[in-house]
Amino acid sequence: FVGRDVTGSDLLRDFDAILLSGGAEAPRDLPVPGRDLDGVHYAMDFLEQQNRRVAGDALEREREILATGKNVLVLGGGDTGSDCIGTSHRQGAKHVYNFELLERPPEVRPEDAPWPLHPMPSQILRTSTSHEEGGSRDWGVSTTRFTGSNGRVEKLHAVRVRFGPPDPANGR
């Protein structure tokens, strides 16, 4: 189907199901003190600007978000976080750190933990090409606040977290 027009009738005739998986573009905020400091950005704002730059399009925002020459901290260990890591490296970040709330997943799925029972379905340690570009990764880190001066972020405060077995009363 690549390179040619496909009608809705073609899709209905040739497939039993059609899955549209464009990803979430609405950010999930981190409601902690200092979140509004300059220098704390949503991933999609950063990635969208880079996509516009690569396409040669004008940026719609007054203020550019660039990782060039900076120490960058990416919060979140999913695909979007991985995209931010790789983009930061390609923009010439000084160093890229990645914090994930969940504990480090196993490198191999334990035989006694089929996919529905593991904390994240099919979650095993994934290292993307973005991670292979360098940087540091840490797991079990929960952000408690950001602090800074003159309205600009300078420090992230966090605590180490460990997840225990689910509570039998509520499953959490």
Which positions does each model-derived feature cover?
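A Rossmann-like FAD-binding core segment of flavoenzymes
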Residues: 1-28, 52-62, 89-172
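Glycine-rich dinucleotide-binding loop and its adjacent helix/turn
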Residues: 27-91
